[in-house]
Amino acid sequence: MTQSDFFSLDGISKRFGVVQALDNVSIAFRPGEVLALVGENGAGKSTMMRILEGVSGPDTGTVRHGSTPIVFGEPRDSHRAGIRVIHQEPEIVPNLTVAENIFVGELPRLAGVLLDWRKLEEQTDRVLATFGMQQDMRPRQLCGTLGPAQRQMIEIMRAIRAGGRLIAFDEPTSSLTDDEARRLFSVVRRLREKGTSIIYISHRLNEIIDLADRIVVLRDGRLVDDSPAAGASEQTIAKLMVGRNIDDLFTRETWRSGEQLLDVAGLTTDRVNDVSLRVRRGEVLGIAGLMGAGRSELAKAIVGYDRRIAGTIAMNGVPVLPNSPHAAIVAGIGFAPEDRKHEALLLFRSILDNAALCVPDKTSSFGFFNRRKAMEIVSPLAAKMSIKAPNLDEQVSKLSGGNQQKVVLARWLARQPMLLILDEPTRGIDIGAKAEIYRLIDELAASGIGIILISSEMPELIGLADRVLVMAGGRITAELARPDIDEATILKHAMPQSASSPGDYIQ
């Protein structure tokens, strides 16, 4: 390995208006090494990726290959240099085939005109065989029929086939099952063995410790640590990310819950089978289970998104009309869905518009939106939740994942619900934003609001919930109360009957 093999950033700075996104950052990306890039949302990770991709250039500083400065006028220049970024949401064309997506831009043609399908299929079969994907997809299969893990693999295969020498993975496991994530880790390790430089970005610190050779920490646009991964702990990484101790992520006491609030009896949908549950005021009820257990479907049935086949729902003893999200809102139920980008937010509207969405009765005058009234409601909520944005007119699509989630929560706080259902509320957000959301859950429960917390993160359920219901196959298989809420017990009841051991499903 020589200096000429390295990609590096040398004194990179980038400013957007008053925000210093990167401040004199220098990093070397070595062949055959997995470099984990961590930091809170807004630390500068995305800006660094945009510079490496050629989407935007640095204000000062240099991108180098070996000792040679390289300038990217557009993403194509970055690709030619051998740099590829595998985004959290894979960039594939759903109405094109697997083969066309893998070889996009370099499709073999007959006489320079007609697509040479025979040659394309042969080339694609070789690529699929190299990655052991022959059973997962076919060359002529439309990519719109593939799942998230398969679409991600297409991006990886495209990057390697095109000669990718530095490959960045941006939150690659955010939408993968445990088995799919393990498969991805194997691919990353194989790439490392072949001498590829890897940048791995993730908020899941356990993944970082497991995969990385070196960990680089960004905070407020500055590089604050660049150290070997050996010996690192989640606690030390988190402290470097946020600049303070966060040992007490879960500070919740077991609050004295009040009278019964929600009563669900015999609820049945296409994916939920005869579920009954109760939630009291001030109680945090956790819902645990593996992917496909029916947790999200249960939440959507309660709030009227999914069609109710049988069963009843009542708030404060008053029946809630079936299949009506509006009826659920009127009854005092708020819902923050797992897929906030597609199911909760108007991405190209402002923070103000999104946060005021559920209180039209308080933000309108004579049938028209009243900005002054909306500002009076939303401004204190944005301040309370520390939403990081220049102002409330900022487009939600420009916010980090943590701040987008805060906007969703602010919307429901404006509505002042009696019950709030949170489906994977901390998925894809950094450790600092997680701590803020945990504190908010504490405060809401202490104020008497009932919380249903659906989470795949065991520490959240163990640290926040008063009771945990475990689901498998659309049914509730166990109810656990403190002090009997622990990971082993949850996993035992979450396993389908066919599972031989927890290792078959959970890493």
UniProtKB/Swiss-Prot annotation:
GO molecular function, one term: ATP binding
Keywords, comma-separated and alphabetical: ATP-binding, Cell inner membrane, Cell membrane, Membrane, Nucleotide-binding, Repeat, Sugar transport, Translocase, Transport
Gene3D superfamilies associated with the record: P-loop containing nucleotide triphosphate hydrolases
Annotated family: Belongs to the ABC transporter superfamily. Ribose importer (TC 3.A.1.2.1) family.
Role played: Part of the ABC transporter complex RbsABC involved in ribose import. Responsible for energy coupling to the transport system.
PANTHER family attached to this UniProt entry: CARBOHYDRATE TRANSPORT ATP-BINDING PROTEIN MG119-RELATED, D-ALLOSE IMPORT ATP-BINDING PROTEIN ALSA-RELATED
Description of how the protein assembles with itself and partners: The complex is composed of an ATP-binding protein (RbsA), two transmembrane proteins (RbsC) and a solute-binding protein (RbsB).
Protein's UniProt name: Ribose import ATP-binding protein RbsA 2
Organism listed in the record: Mesorhizobium japonicum (strain LMG 29417 / CECT 9101 / MAFF 303099)
Lineage, opening ranks: Bacteria, Pseudomonadati, Pseudomonadota, Alphaproteobacteria, Hyphomicrobiales
